[in-house]
Curated annotation (Swiss-Prot):
This is NADH-quinone oxidoreductase subunit B. Residues 203-212 have a biased composition (Basic and acidic residues). Residues 213-224 have a biased composition (Polar residues). The gene is nuoB. Keywords: 4Fe-4S, Cell inner membrane, Cell membrane, Iron, Iron-sulfur, Membrane, Metal-binding, NAD, Quinone, Translocase, Transport, Ubiquinone. It comes from Pseudomonas syringae pv. syringae (strain B728a). The keyword Coiled coil does not apply. Its main location: membrane. Residues 201-224 are annotated as: Disordered. It is found in: Cell inner membrane. One of its GO terms (cellular component) is plasma membrane. It is an enzyme of class 7 (translocase). The keyword Translocase applies.
Length: 224
């Protein structure tokens, strides 16, 4: 599996996303196993245990921009029960949150505020872009709307829809958990390679292309 490597360099504060250098590398744990099978396997087990704890205890930051935020909060109600994924603990401060959901239209005036909130989050942290407006500007192709939050934030999961249903948000959360389970991060700030390795996850659109092509009976737009 290929990984995207982002170097952690505390002496270069100006090299932030999207300016920071990134490169595509192979799984670093495989290289460790080839060098020393015992230490490599031990590091693999420790990394898996840490990732298991991270992905099953994701605390979201209570933040929303537009109508997609209403659908996001619906996922916290009893019929959907987001507590199954360990993500029911909504945090009022970005310093206590693990991931941020950009739900709604991102205006240019809000972009610096969103970036400031993201920078206040502690590592490790992740971003979910929810809805067409957050993904690409949606129907607002105008000067005052940012055409995709990935212009200034590193997005981990994109949830399409206008607005997406709560089930779509939950699927995006599960995809984020899957990605976190395959991440490679340093176990401390002084031990190991100081870099963040994020797995290159396959696109759900490409994976389901053949399945969508085979569909012949389209559902009526009057049916929900």
């Amino acid at each position: 599996m290929q990984y995207n490597l982002t170097r952690i360099d505390p002496d270069a504060p100006n090299e932030q996303y999207p300016i920071g250098k990134r490169e595509t590398v192979s799984d670093p744990l495989e290289d460790q196993v080839h060098k020393n099978i015992y230490m490599g396997k031990l590091e693999d087990v420790l990394s898996g245990a840490v990732n298991w704890g991270r992905k099953n205890s994701l605390w979201p930051y209570n933040f929303g921009l537009s109508c997609c935020y209403v659908e996001m909060t619906t996922a916290f109600t009893a019929p959907h029960d987001i507590a199954r994924f360990g993500a029911e603990v909504i945090r009022a401060s970005p310093r206590q949150a693990d991931f941020m959901v950009i739900a709604g239209t991102c205006f240019i005036k809000m972009a610096p505020i969103i970036q400031r909130l993201y920078e206040q989050m502690l590592e490790p942290k992740w971003v979910i872009s929810m809805g067409s407006c957050a993904n690409s500007g949606g129907m607002y192709d105008i000067y005052s709307v940012v055409q995709g939050v990935d212009k200034f934030l590193p997005v981990d999961v994109y949830v399409p829809g206008c607005p997406p249903r709560p089930e779509a948000f939950l699927q995006g959360l599960m995809l984020l958990q899957e990605s976190i389970g395959k991440e490679r991060r340093p176990l401390s700030w002084v031990v190991g390679d100081q870099g963040v390795y994020r797995a290159e996850m396959p696109s759900q659109k490409e994976q389901r292309r053949e399945q969508r092509i085979q569909v012949t009976n389209l559902r009526s737009p009057d049916e929900v």
